[in-house]
């Protein structure tokens, strides 16, 4: 590469490594809460104004109410018997990341596709920022082409 290199790891370069255990506890508690299908009290893991930023198909949600009304509740309505299986979780100071899959039954409308009753896998990656014991930011990538292919829709 010629010339100046772009700044790398701008968001995580000054992370406080002493926060790793706290970050891990928050993320593991939140994942357990999602696996238990908690909605009413899941806010204990999120800061008041947290941002949830997903790829196209998910969009960006500001705050818990918007996240729940425009992602968590519709997603749970579309997929029942859902369990999150992280293949790996990584923790570094105030940062955490995971990739894995959710296994679920397609039991409601999702992206315009009527319920099929099929058990599918939903592959994802998550990146979280945790400050003062709460998730402040969550970047999400869901493999929608893979999900839709399992539901009989070829987007390509």
Language-model features: locations:
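A cross-kingdom feature marking solvent-exposed beta-strand/loop segments within repeated
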Residues: 56, 106-120
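Short, structured motif recognition centered on aromatic/hydrophobic residues
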Residues: 23-27, 52, 75, 125-128, ...
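A solvent-exposed, acidic/Ser-Thr-rich amphipathic alpha-helical stretch
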Residues: 21, 40-94, 101-103
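Short, low-complexity N-terminal intrinsically disordered segments enriched in polar/charged residues
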Residues: 2-48, 154-156
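A short, structured loop/turn motif at beta-sheet edges
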Residues: 89-97, 129-136
